[in-house]
């Protein structure tokens, strides 16, 4: 999964192309070696201790965090302290930057880069929890918002993606994709036309044909 897009989006880079990029290879060996080298160059050849790992109090997130904790220790000798908090408290701490490491909660209303690029990565984006700022990326956003030609927008998206790869705002972990199902007597739902889960989906017209 790329930094910039949902992997199931029409804007996403094809999987075979993504696999050629550093950090997206099928096996992690090369990435781990590079990470160790970068840590050594930064003065942490022996690893890190006491990293504050902020995690929302939810079974699936706790499980992911524990797995990440083990992988960081085994691969890079980075020791983290899990700090479990209620979901509401997590948002407060995340917005305030009170963490060293956390599993984010980025979502969007539309499957369009104008929506999620501004929300996730713009200077004052509501979900830019790392407070990331890149001037070149910021200049691309209004161009992307105004461009109506899809091919030209794809070019802008690739440019934005290249900037994110050179200067990562975050590390992608996973995307949630939900499959919809309904009884045949429920009429009108068309999953192709909506996106998201309970917080963004609204059926304006639906009926039961029984």
Tell me what each language-model feature is:
Residues 32-52:
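Immediate post-signal peptide segment of exported/extracytoplasmic ligand-binding proteins
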Residues 1-17, 59-71, 91-210:
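Detector for C-terminal structural segments
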Residues 68-82:
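Short alpha-helix C-terminal cap/hinge motif
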């Amino acid at each position: 999964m790329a930094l910039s897009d949902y992997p199931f989006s029409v804007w996403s880079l094809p999987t075979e192309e993504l696999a050629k990029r550093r950090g997206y290879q099928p096996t992690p060996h090369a990435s781990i070696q590079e990470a160790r080298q970068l840590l050594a160059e930064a003065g942490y050849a022996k690893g890190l201790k006491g990293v504050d790992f902020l995690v929302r109090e939810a079974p699936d997130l706790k499980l992911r965090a524990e797995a990440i904790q083990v992988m960081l220790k085994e691969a890079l000798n980075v020791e983290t302290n899990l700090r479990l908090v209620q979901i509401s408290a997590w948002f407060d701490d995340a917005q305030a930057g009170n963490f060293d490491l956390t599993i984010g909660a980025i979502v969007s209303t539309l499957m369009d880069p104008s929506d999620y690029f501004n929300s996730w990565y713009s200077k004052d984006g509501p979900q830019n929890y790392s407070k990331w700022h890149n001037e070149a990326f910021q200049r691309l956003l209004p161009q992307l918002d105004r461009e109506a030609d899809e091919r030209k927008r794809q070019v802008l998206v690739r440019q934005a993606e290249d900037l994110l790869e050179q200067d990562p705002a975050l590390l992608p972990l996973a995307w949630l994709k939900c499959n919809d199902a309904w009884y045949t007597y429920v009429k009108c739902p068309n999953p192709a036309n909506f996106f998201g889960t309970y917080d963004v989906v609204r059926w304006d017209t639906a009926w039961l044909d029984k």
